[in-house]
């Protein structure tokens, strides 16, 4: 491609509304342009990278045995009502009506559509397992779209759905897809981690997320320093402290703590560390058969934070997790929130593992402006149910027994789920088994954020000059910069000859033949992030050389003109060959 005939829409200034580096560089490099909040047009340069990501995803999915389909983006409400998600999904589901007043939605995901398709197409166990995928535009009406294509409302996603006769078959495909995702992210040149995850609104029994490690990541991911354990912060297990709980050493004492309503304030007032206290959080209980919901107390160590996903998934807790209001607390306990404690508490109590290991601790006295010191489980407060309620912290023991936990920031670019029969049962998707009996199919689903990968790669691969693309997804693998080619026929001819030679060898090449100053050309090529750059100049040609510089290199080097291709093949062995 000749730059003189190509849209090079680079910008010198960083847009004021671009918060993270990938958003800034995608705008400055001329990859995308904003249409409205969370909506972006992909310009030719950005689209080249996007298509390369799609190609790698498609190739690996095809290798796995999955079959490509393309489903409608607009979906009828009846399918979502059948699965029960029409009301459950919330505000992210963009609902609309056609001219006849019928309800539709713009699909954020396609479980319902694929289940409807397969229940009408597959009839026998002999047709299973089957895995179908698409690469398609999705829409989620994000409350606060931000970070460019990282958290856009409209985005491109690869979503796949597998169907099975039994859980064992699902397990096998799940393993295949896990490896397929690793193959994809390896080929994309990303530093990533697969981690155990919560299934969220999609549902299902088991799931893994794939995170690109980046300081700008919105998610916290946890992994062992010495083992294979890895999970996101929502799923990471906080193991119980080792050893027995210490024996009581203090007597229970009530202390006046006027105006002290937070853990930090009480700790400072009493002169003791927060880890020697507990905090009591009251949440709504699961409704009984009459539809009435009481309260449940969650007890954590004072320096720990509640993991809301863990709590919400516990039996007896209302979903979604709902904190009790001040009025509800005062009515049930008789005090304000800052003074609650587990001693003689008139509601069911669930104690976190770490809090259950404390002795001689501090807690609220269940009356305003008073706390208790020297509190001990069994003697002063009942402890009938212990659960993992908290977020892990760096340095915690790893659940696999190998080393301690490290916490990093990550960008989620993939997620795989074992759905089980959540959708197939609700929508009666079944086949006849080997005995001729009707059997509800087991399902899996597997998503990759294709457009998000582009931004995530930039978060990992950039410097002060711009993007540094991995060869596999660079919009162009090679740039040829001609210096004063519009004035020098020798330079123009040499540039054209090298351009054709590299193109015929299978490389994606950008020939920068623009009538621009050398500094402008170099700055644009570095901003765009093209991995390999050759400079053609009269001075170099007189010596029989070209100047070469890799995007990650500090130094330039002179290469004999007739060795340019062989040099490039060594520098980029995959290239386009």
Curated annotation (Swiss-Prot):
It comes from the Bacteria. Gene3D superfamilies: Anticodon-binding domain, Bira Bifunctional Protein, Domain 2, YbaK/aminoacyl-tRNA synthetase-associated domain. The keyword Cytoplasm applies. Its main location: cytoplasm. Its EC number is 6.1.1.15. InterPro entries: aa-tRNA-synt_IIb (IPR002314), aa-tRNA-synth_II (IPR006195), aa-tRNA-synth_II/BPL/LPL (IPR045864), Anticodon-bd (IPR004154), Anticodon-bd_dom_sf (IPR036621), Pro-tRNA-ligase_IIa (IPR002316), Pro-tRNA-synth_IIa_bac-type (IPR004500), Pro-tRNA-Synthase_IIa_type1 (IPR023717). Catalyzes the attachment of proline to tRNA(Pro) in a two-step reaction: proline is first activated by ATP to form Pro-AMP and then transferred to the acceptor end of tRNA(Pro). As ProRS can inadvertently accommodate and process non-cognate amino acids such as alanine and cysteine, to avoid such errors it has two additional distinct editing activities against alanine. One activity is designated as 'pretransfer' editing and involves the tRNA(Pro)-independent hydrolysis of activated Ala-AMP. This is Proline--tRNA ligase.
